[in-house]
């Protein structure tokens, strides 16, 4: 991925989600296995992929609150550099969540 190019919807790996939630990837795997976390979608290679909305859901399940800061940090590490676009992306997901 180019450092300044935003894809329409960022996808996260289990490792990314573990960093965001401050847990190990094994913890996430165990919680999925025990049905405490919903099973994520899979990509063409059958790897688990998590959307931004999935990550917010897991934050709510884990901590009963939403905090976009660790998500922004991981997105930045993945090459998302445009903070304005990151803000719009996160605001868009949060706005949709409030409307539901």
Regions found by a protein language model. Give the residues of each.
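Exposed, interaction-prone assembly regions rather than primary DNA-binding/catalytic cores
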Residues: 84-100
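Short helix-start
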Residues: 11-14, 38-63
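Polyanion-binding surface elements
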Residues: 2-31
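A short, Lys/Arg-enriched interface patch at domain edges and termini
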Residues: 55-85
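Compositionally biased, low-complexity segments enriched in small residues
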Residues: 1, 23-26, 53, 84-86
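Major-groove DNA-recognition helix of helix-turn-helix-type DNA-binding domains
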Residues: 22-48
């Amino acid at each position: 991925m180019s450092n300044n190019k935003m894809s329409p919807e960022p996808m996260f790996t289990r490792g990314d989600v573990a960093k965001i939630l401050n847990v190990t990837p094994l913890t996430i795997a165990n919680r999925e296995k025990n049905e405490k976390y919903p099973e994520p979608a899979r990509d063409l290679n059958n790897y688990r992929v998590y959307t931004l909305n999935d990550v917010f859901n897991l934050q709510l399940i884990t901590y009963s609150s939403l905090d976009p800061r660790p998500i922004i940090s991981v997105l930045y590490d993945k090459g998302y550099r445009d903070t304005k676009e990151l803000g719009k992306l996160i605001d868009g997901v949060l706005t949709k969540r409030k409307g539901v």
